[in-house]
């Protein structure tokens, strides 16, 4: 079976385009409707992956098994905070729409753009998390 490898430069270029699309949607949701409340959504989605990054930095070889008796409260707190921030990032435009601060198109564009921003950060961390024994070169 032929193995498909993608160079790291291609990964970075595609993720930067994906991230730019997310920022474009959120900024357009602000600029087209002359209301800059959705910019708070960018801040929330940029802060969302930070707890997982901080608390999972030292646990490279830890396996999470729901049947084991060992608990890791740091990771549980990180998952809770990340979930809270992602949920807040989705709910904030809905609250703004409910309070009639933004329109429904602005709400939809802001939520989709924020989710694209968060998912591009998570995919970036997933793409570039590799073992030391893994060779990522295309020609070797």
UniProtKB/Swiss-Prot annotation:
The modification Phosphoserine is found at residue 137. This is Vacuolar protein sorting-associated protein 55. GO terms for biological process: late endosome to vacuole transport via multivesicular body sorting pathway; protein transport. Residues 1-11, 59-76, 129-140 are cytoplasmic. Belongs to the OB-RGRP/VPS55 family. Present with 2340 molecules/cell in log phase SD medium. It holds the Pfam family Vps55. The chain crosses the membrane at residues 12-32, 38-58, 77-97, 108-128. One of its GO terms (cellular component) is Vps55/Vps68 complex. Involved in protein transport from endosomes to the vacuole. Residues 33-37, 98-107 are lumenal. It is found in: Endosome membrane. Keywords: Endosome, Membrane, Phosphoprotein, Protein transport, Transmembrane, Transmembrane helix, Transport. It is a multi-pass membrane protein. InterPro entries: Vps55/LEPROT.
